[in-house]
């Protein structure tokens, strides 16, 4: 990790200890800031740095954020994919036609979007012992 400032490094170490098994940070920023004696902005800045680490998606705070990080890394995060992610609950409920319409995507593009999402790892932290 390329965090050399001592206060940020301490925050990074504490945040690493707070990861769940899937690699997510589940606590709210305000709670993290209060428990670490830092400001919300300081916590956000360190999280942004940590999210640049491998595996991509670790330190996300939700499945959607995890997918966004991975899709951005694959250079597949465009406005249409953002719309898909903003409405991903439609995929979970099986409303693929409604989701495709919301994304204004043709069948081929929509199938590619689903394939890209399936290539993502929803639990990037599971590879750690």
PLM-predicted stretches and their roles:
Residues 1-129:
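Alpha-helical scaffold/interaction cores of sigma-54-like transcription cofactors
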